[in-house]
């Protein structure tokens, strides 16, 4: 047998060396960042944090000393509970309502273009709003987190604030980076009662708007869908 014949790989060896089907498919290039963001909470959070650093400056990322994260089914009382929290914790600013943030010009531009407001966009809107100096003493966030990815982002956010606290401990900026205090509030309600309250709220809104239209006095209420 010649040297060339001896060095020739067997059929079994050739099959073993064949690339996987995914590597052979020319239509499948390297994974895009957008694809990873859908699943990777760390990528989402660190991307958002980097963007905030670029926009505001790292030393200006000062968040509220205390944050209440409020969630619950429609009709569970998310609209009424904040008043009690504000009174109890001596907060003066109205809650940050995620559904309202999604009506902002930036968010509407993406939605109108057929793009969904995903975890990355929502997380950035929420964190960006919390940087407002008016929330320095504390804030209530209504409607975040709502997905598993957002829950993981919230954990990373708490970790980052703890990291900033440690970094500035013992410095003249210590008071500007307080120890993070997160309160997770979940309001529960059974389905039947939820439906009843939503119907009642809708009826009251319709009646109020009809009165405003007839009298020309007052402001119309938004009909929630």
Regions found by a protein language model. Give the residues of each.
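Glycine-rich phosphate-binding loop of ATP-dependent small-molecule kinases
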Residues: 1-225
């Amino acid at each position: 047998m010649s040297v060339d014949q001896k060095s020739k790989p067997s059929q079994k060896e050739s099959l073993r060396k064949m690339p996987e089907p995914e590597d052979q498919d020319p239509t499948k290039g390297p994974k895009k960042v957008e694809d990873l963001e859908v699943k990777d909470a760390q990528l989402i959070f660190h991307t958002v944090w980097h963007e905030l650093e670029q926009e505001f400056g790292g030393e200006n990322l000062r968040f509220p000393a205390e944050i209440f994260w409020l969630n619950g089914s429609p009709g569970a009382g998310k609209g009424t509970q904040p008043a009690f929290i504000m009174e109890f914790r001596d907060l003066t600013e109205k809650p940050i309502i995620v559904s309202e943030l999604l009506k902002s010009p930036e968010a509407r531009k993406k939605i109108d273009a057929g793009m969904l407001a995903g975890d990355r966009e929502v997380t950035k809107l929420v964190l960006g709003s919390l940087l407002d100096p008016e929330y320095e003493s504390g804030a209530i966030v209504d409607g975040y987190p709502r997905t598993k990815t957002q829950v993981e982002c919230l954990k990373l956010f708490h970790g980052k604030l703890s990291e900033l606290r440690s970094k500035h401990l013992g410095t003249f900026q210590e008071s500007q980076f307080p120890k993070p205090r997160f309160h997770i509030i979940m309001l529960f309600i059974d389905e039947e009662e939820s439906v009843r309250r939503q119907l009642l709220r809708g009826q009251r809104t319709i009646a109020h708007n009809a009165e405003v239209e007839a009298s020309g006095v007052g402001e119309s209420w938004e009909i929630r869908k």
